[in-house]
């Protein structure tokens, strides 16, 4: 298994799909990285040479991925909450942010129902 950005990349998958195992890299960014490096999308990771894997590592290193990206996202949410803006308040109360209704159909964001004690 190749190790890129601290993640074990699956060997038996095509390169374009295998790179999506890294947090912050989807299919589009994966295709862009492979095009920059000059590796075909349909090549399996197990067929790549060490030199090509090193090139992939360098290509992925240009982007914010994994722990750095998770930290950046959580810091952005924390900043909104500290500002006290509307989005920050909605985050703090675990409610939908983007104008969805909450009388019904907000169970995913609100979590399971809490019974009322008598």
Swiss-Prot record:
Extract the Gene3D superfamilies matched here.
1.10.8.50, 30s ribosomal protein s13, domain 2
- Domain of life of the source: Bacteria
Any single Pfam family the record assigns to this protein: Ribosomal_S13
The entry lists its GO molecular-function terms as:
rRNA binding; structural constituent of ribosome; tRNA binding
Q: Which UniProt keywords apply?
A: Ribonucleoprotein, Ribosomal protein, RNA-binding, rRNA-binding, tRNA-binding
The protein's matches in InterPro entries, at most eight in alphabetical order, are given as: Rbsml_uS13_C, Ribosomal_uS13, Ribosomal_uS13-like_H2TH, Ribosomal_uS13_bac-type, Ribosomal_uS13_CS
Q: Give the multimer and partner information.
A: Part of the 30S ribosomal subunit. Forms a loose heterodimer with protein S19. Forms two bridges to the 50S subunit in the 70S ribosome.
What is the protein's known function? Located at the top of the head of the 30S subunit, it contacts several helices of the 16S rRNA. In the 70S ribosome it contacts the 23S rRNA (bridge B1a) and protein L5 of the 50S subunit (bridge B1b), connecting the 2 subunits; these bridges are implicated in subunit movement. Contacts the tRNAs in the A and P-sites.
The protein here is known as Small ribosomal subunit protein uS13
| Source species | Vibrio vulnificus (strain YJ016)
